[in-house]
């Protein structure tokens, strides 16, 4: 019986280890994220937007509070992804609602199989020439895990979910409430997203 018990022990050990590994990978360490407690509050700006970010292919740094009093759709993007075509719908969405206190914020990232250019000038050129992107785009950065930029760390902290791929979308109300993330599979011009945006305008 001893060999049988030992075999059962090994099976249980490896099963639990694999299960824990899968759980950890799905969790993406979101619970370990910490809000930026050192940030000076900006009057009238929701805390979720109070982050300094560098503009794409530029030395200019802005605070996302520049977009306070707007409904915000924050998206992690990439130029060489199977979902890159969603840029077209994102730009159309921006053009439709930008006059109604709505903005899209794009955050290029190489987190997922390095599907973004390493050179920000290439990212900018691609977005402009291929899709005519005019919504704000920011510096290439990490959007998941402990190396994520502070904005996406806080999105993960609030929602309990980091991006699991490119083109994950976070909708934020004018008062700073973050709605549940929309996955890459939900198109920007889907009725689900459009209805959610219109309910906040």
Language-model-detected regions and their locations in the chain:
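C-terminal motif of bacterial Sec signal peptides marking the signal peptidase cleavage site
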Residues: 16-17
């Amino acid at each position: 019986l001893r060999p049988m018990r030992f075999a059962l022990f090994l099976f249980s050990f490896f099963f639990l280890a694999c299960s824990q590994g899968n759980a950890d990978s799905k969790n993406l360490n979101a619970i370990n994220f910490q809000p930026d407690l050192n940030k000076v509050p900006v009057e009238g700006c929701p805390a979720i937007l109070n982050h300094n970010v560098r503009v794409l292919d530029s030395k200019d740094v802005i605070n996302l509070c520049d977009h306070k009093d707007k409904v915000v759709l924050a998206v992690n993007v990439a130029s060489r992804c199977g979902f890159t075509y969603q840029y077209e719908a994102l730009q159309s969405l921006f053009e439709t609602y930008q006059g109604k206190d709505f903005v899209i914020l794009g955050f290029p990232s190489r987190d997922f199989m390095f599907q973004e250019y390493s050179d920000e000038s290439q990212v900018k050129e691609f977005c402009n020439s291929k899709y005519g992107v005019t919504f704000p785009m920011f510096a290439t950065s990490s959007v998941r895990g402990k190396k994520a930029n502070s904005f996406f760390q806080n999105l993960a902290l609030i929602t309990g979910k980091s991006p699991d791929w490119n083109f994950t979308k976070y909708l934020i109300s004018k008062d700073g409430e973050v709605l549940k993330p929309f996955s890459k599979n939900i198109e920007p011009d889907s009725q689900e997203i459009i209805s959610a945006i219109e309910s906040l305008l």
